[in-house]
């Protein structure tokens, strides 16, 4: 973000959003020429915000990323660049989607939360409540990884261990993301979960590709 913002004499903005575990953090993003925003998902959901002994891939989430996007949309900005990397999360971007109005349901038709701990019970997703301003925005994802959402080269297997996942956790988290991805793919009518980069930032790349 710094390199881009400073190269074009942009400015920094700060917004209070939810951290990886719901605690409030002050997240920074850049604004260029008044109509373009540049942000790093790690500002709200990064490993840098969590002590190693507190890492928990079942609870860490990207809700704050959605709050950052809403703050940017509130400013009237529709050209957005988002950097993916250094995340403490493995929620497939469900936190961000929930913040933007997407709902998840279990087999009993009850609404459930957006952490991997709760997503293990997902059978349905409702994207009809997605913030309509998202469709007006041009969101460009900046990522240097090509991992798919799930599988042995996916988000959980490759990056889960650095987020606190044990070998057993990795298998569980991978199954959660596989089911989650299949449900969203079926809902939107296209397979995004196997696309290169969908596994970036614990699957946040997938949520941005498939729904946003």
Please describe what each predicted stretch is.
Residues 1-84, 88-212:
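N-terminal loops that bind phosphate or other acidic moieties
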């Amino acid at each position: 973000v710094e390199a881009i913002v400073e190269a074009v004499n942009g400015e920094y903005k700060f917004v209070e959003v939810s951290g990886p575990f719901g605690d409030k953090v002050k997240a920074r993003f850049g604004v260029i020429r008044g109509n373009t925003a540049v942000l790093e998902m790690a500002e709200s959901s990064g490993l840098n915000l969590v002590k190693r002994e507190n890492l928990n891939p079942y609870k860490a989430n990207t809700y704050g990323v959605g709050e950052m996007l809403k703050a940017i949309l509130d400013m009237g900005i529709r050209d957005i660049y988002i950097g993916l990397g250094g995340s403490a999360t493995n929620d497939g971007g469900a936190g961000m989607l929930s913040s933007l109005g997407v709902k998840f349901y279990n087999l009993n038709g009850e609404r459930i939360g957006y952490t991997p701990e709760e997503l293990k019970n997902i059978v349905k997703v409702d994207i009809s409540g997605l913030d309509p301003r998202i469709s007006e925005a041009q969101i460009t994802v900046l990522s240097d990884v090509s991992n798919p959402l799930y599988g042995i080269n996916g988000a959980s297997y490759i990056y889960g261990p650095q987020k606190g996942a044990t070998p057993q956790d990795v298998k569980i988290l991978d199954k959660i993301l596989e089911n989650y991805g299949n449900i969203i793919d079926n809902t939107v009518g296209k397979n995004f979960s196997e696309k290169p980069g969908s596994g970036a930032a614990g699957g946040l790349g997938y949520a941005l590709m498939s729904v946003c």
